[in-house]
Curated annotation (Swiss-Prot):
Folate-dependent protein involved in Fe/S cluster biogenesis. Functionally complements an E.coli mutant defective in ygfZ. Its EC number is 2.1.-.-. InterPro entries: GCST_C, GCV_T_N, GcvT/YgfZ/DmdA, GcvT/YgfZ_C, TrmE/GcvT_dom1, YgfZ/GcvT_CS. It comes from Arabidopsis thaliana. The keyword Ion transport does not apply. Residues 1-57 form a transit peptide. It is found in: Plastid, Chloroplast. This is Putative transferase At1g60990, chloroplastic.
Length: 432
């Protein structure tokens, strides 16, 4: 396959700015950021692959440019077919639900490493000269302080700071990539388009169908990264990302697994997904489906739309401090956030709950018969034992370790959850 055809088939996210031709050097144009990639060591072995190594590094592009437009992936659902053949359960709308190993996968998250297909999550490409300023004004994070190769979490909120969704952002050379929840992608795109004015140089594009997204999580994630010669990302800040070539296809790897600051996220074309997936499994990653991922989301404490994120709760009650800038100036929801901070207006907070029995989301939380909150998510524990939930509880009513009642007679002990425990209120002079 020649270079031009390969680029067309990859059909990834951005138009390549230019391609440089260097004698006797294998180059791959990166559709993410307009650079050319020289191969970097990526060992592929086991699982039927020939042992081979790829060398990659970024090379500056020349002024001569070739433009590539988006096109459909060459083989629709090739990755999902591979999952189905290997025993994975795939829903009608293309979500990898389970590998009949949920408890094993949850154990691997705690003690080993898992890989989960998050391709059903939304991916939004925001391009144009005004993209950073635009997102700076539309979300809670300080985009104007970020540079190419960095990343962050940011929150989409209403004008009154009520929560819509958490977005994970990668700052690339020619665009900003937003990863959002599956249920909010279209509504966020529609909302953003409403705020683009005539003179704004901003373009919004849904690239979910043109890309695949994997998360690698667990304490042994770094070992796999080292085996694949991607160790230069180990220890880098959350959101830091780099572009590579994998089996002749472009892939972007970022620090953080969406559910945790640890682990990694991998973005690639549909054509490269099978090779990446099989290689990660060959290196020891345990596959995880969306059912186990949802259990993990709840036990880790990451808020989700239509559960913890809704017009019922504001962003400070959700405890998403790492995603909020308090001093970047005017942005949507800023006035409400400022008032809440100034007048100590945060009356409730999101907490974990160790429950004595199963409970339905939406159940009332009480203390001494008085309503103090609401259960928003519930999941059973590993191996059919234990019950856990997330819920909003009034600050003055209960603290970590206190007992509350959920529903009629279910006992719940208020607990700390990892995702929220990592959040830290920014100081007044913070530039974040």
């Amino acid at each position: 396959m020649n270079l031009l055809q390969s680029c067309k088939d990859m059909a990834m996210m951005m138009r390549i700015d230019s391609v440089s031709h260097i004698t006797n050097t294998a180059l791959l144009p990166c559709l993410y950021n307009g650079t050319v990639l020289r191969r970097r060591s990526l060992s592929l072995r086991k699982c039927g692959f020939r042992e081979r190594k790829f060398q990659l590094r970024c090379v500056s592009a020349s002024s001569d440019s070739l433009q590539f437009d988006f096109s459909p992936p060459p083989i629709d659902h090739d990755f999902l077919d591979t999952i189905s053949v290997s025993g994975g359960k795939v829903s009608e709308d293309g979500v990898v639900e389970s590998f009949d190993n949920d408890d094993e996968a949850l154990d691997a998250f705690d003690n080993g490493v898992v890989v989960v297909d998050l391709s059903h999550f939304g991916r939004i490409r925001v391009s144009g000269d005004d993209r950073a300023h635009f997102l700076h004004n539309q979300t809670t994070a300080n985009f104007e302080s970020l540079y190419e190769g960095q990343g962050c979490d940011t929150v989409f909120v209403t004008p009154t700071a009520r929560t819509i969704d958490i977005a994970h952002a990668w700052i690339m050379k020619n665009a900003i990539l937003l990863t959002v929840s599956p249920t909010t992608c279209q509504s966020i795109i529609e909302m953003l388009n409403k705020y683009i004015f005539f003179a704004d140089k901003v373009e919004i594009k849904d690239i979910t169908k043109q890309t695949c997204l994997f998360a690698l999580a667990g304490p042994k994630s770094n070992q796999i990264m080292s085996k694949l010669n991607l160790g230069d990302l180990i220890g880098q800040p959350y959101g830091r990302h780099q572009h590579y070539s994998f089996d002749g296809m472009p892939i972007t790897v970022g620090v953080g697994s969406l559910i945790s600051d640890e682990g990694f996220t991998m973005l690639m074309s549909p054509g490269g997904a099978v090779s990446v997936w099989k290689t990660l499994l060959a290196e020891g990653a345990i596959p995880m489906g969306s059912v186990a991922w949802e259990k993990l989301r709840i036990t880790q404490g990451r808020p989700a739309p239509e559960r913890e994120l809704s017009k019922e709760f504001n962003v400070l009650e959700a405890g998403l401090w790492n995603s909020i800038s308090l001093n970047k100036g005017c942005y949507k929801g800023q006035e409400t956030i400022a008032r809440l901070m100034t007048y100590d207006g945060i009356k409730q907070r999101l907490c974990g709950l160790n429950l004595s029995a199963p409970s339905e989301p939406g159940s009332t939380i009480t203390v001494d018969g008085k309503k103090v909150g609401k259960l928003t998510s519930y999941t059973g524990g590993k191996n059919g034992s234990g019950h856990f939930g997330l819920g909003y509880i009034k600050k003055q009513a209960a603290s970590i370790g206190n007992t509350v009642t959920v529903g009629e007679d279910i006992s719940g002990i208020v607990s700390e959850v990892p995702y929220l425990a990592r959040q830290h209120p920014p100081s007044a002079n913070s530039s974040s």
